[in-house]
Amino acid sequence: MKFAVIVLPGSNCDIDMFHAIKDELGEEAEYVWHTETSLDEYDGVLIPGGFSYGDYLRCGAIARFANIMPAVKKAAEEGKPVLGVCNGFQILQELGLLPGAMRRNKDLKFICRPVELIVQNNETLFTSSYGKGESITIPVAHGEGNFYCDEETLAGLQENNQIAFTYGTDINGSVADIAGVVNEKGNVLGMMPHPERAVDSLLGSADGLKLFQSIVKNWRETHVATA
């Protein structure tokens, strides 16, 4: 499986993402600069965290206009797995691929520490290696990770089982403690915590590795079955 790691001005988690795929999983990964216009040669798309364009105007608001973004939307429409982490999640929201918006954390402070997540849906291509209700430890690093949506949108997320992860405790004021959601089709995941920073027990947790393993496992099953 071959992954594209999108690199924008201000990205700072692209190397971690590349390491998780290339070194920990042994899969192919390439950095793709934001000026590129095609992702056709890739099987999966990863949008890492950071501060794209300095978070000016609004997190992800400028990045959504990058040359590569139409190709990201095309990949999502084609059913390819698309993962956005932290700033990547915010960008996916700005693109309209995922619902909701991000506000400043409730205490107006930047949070950078390991947190408990609860796997709410283990039937997605990103979470199938976890158990439903499993408690995992993944680090966060954000100042604007307070997920917000209106009641109607929240009801839809719950009804469609689109909430992939919630926080074990309220860390930032997110509606329903939401930490990660998928689109209705289930092939686009956005999450504020950083699974790429939890792929080796030496770093405190390897719980994030299962997420990347799930992507590869489901991709292989699908492509072997259709080959």
From Swiss-Prot:
<protein>
    <recommendedName>
        <fullName>Phosphoribosylformylglycinamidine synthase subunit PurQ</fullName>
        <ecNumber>6.3.5.3</ecNumber>
        <ecNumber>3.5.1.2</ecNumber>
    </recommendedName>
</protein>
<keyword id="KW-0658">Purine biosynthesis</keyword>
<feature type="active site" description="Nucleophile">
    <location>
        <position position="86"/>
    </location>
</feature>
<dbReference type="InterPro" id="IPR010075">
    <property type="entry name" value="PRibForGlyAmidine_synth_PurQ"/>
</dbReference>
<keyword id="KW-0378">Hydrolase</keyword>
<dbReference type="GO" id="GO:0005737">
    <property type="term" value="C:cytoplasm"/>
</dbReference>
<feature type="domain" description="Glutamine amidotransferase type-1">
    <location>
        <begin position="3"/>
        <end position="225"/>
    </location>
</feature>
<keyword id="KW-0436">Ligase</keyword>
<dbReference type="InterPro" id="IPR029062">
    <property type="entry name" value="Class_I_gatase-like"/>
</dbReference>
<comment type="pathway">
    <text>Purine metabolism; IMP biosynthesis via de novo pathway; 5-amino-1-(5-phospho-D-ribosyl)imidazole from N(2)-formyl-N(1)-(5-phospho-D-ribosyl)glycinamide: step 1/2.</text>
</comment>
<dbReference type="GO" id="GO:0004359">
    <property type="term" value="F:glutaminase activity"/>
</dbReference>
<keyword id="KW-0315">Glutamine amidotransferase</keyword>
<comment type="subunit">
    <text>Part of the FGAM synthase complex composed of 1 PurL, 1 PurQ and 2 PurS subunits.</text>
</comment>
<dbReference type="Pfam" id="PF13507">
    <property type="entry name" value="GATase_5"/>
</dbReference>
<dbReference type="GO" id="GO:0006189">
    <property type="term" value="P:'de novo' IMP biosynthetic process"/>
</dbReference>
<keyword id="KW-0963">Cytoplasm</keyword>
<keyword id="KW-0067">ATP-binding</keyword>
<feature type="active site">
    <location>
        <position position="194"/>
    </location>
</feature>
<dbReference type="GO" id="GO:0005524">
    <property type="term" value="F:ATP binding"/>
</dbReference>
<comment type="function">
    <text>Part of the phosphoribosylformylglycinamidine synthase complex involved in the purines biosynthetic pathway. Catalyzes the ATP-dependent conversion of formylglycinamide ribonucleotide (FGAR) and glutamine to yield formylglycinamidine ribonucleotide (FGAM) and glutamate. The FGAM synthase complex is composed of three subunits. PurQ produces an ammonia molecule by converting glutamine to glutamate. PurL transfers the ammonia molecule to FGAR to form FGAM in an ATP-dependent manner.</text>
</comment>
<keyword id="KW-0547">Nucleotide-binding</keyword>
<dbReference type="GO" id="GO:0004642">
    <property type="term" value="F:phosphoribosylformylglycinamidine synthase activity"/>
</dbReference>
<feature type="active site">
    <location>
        <position position="196"/>
    </location>
</feature>
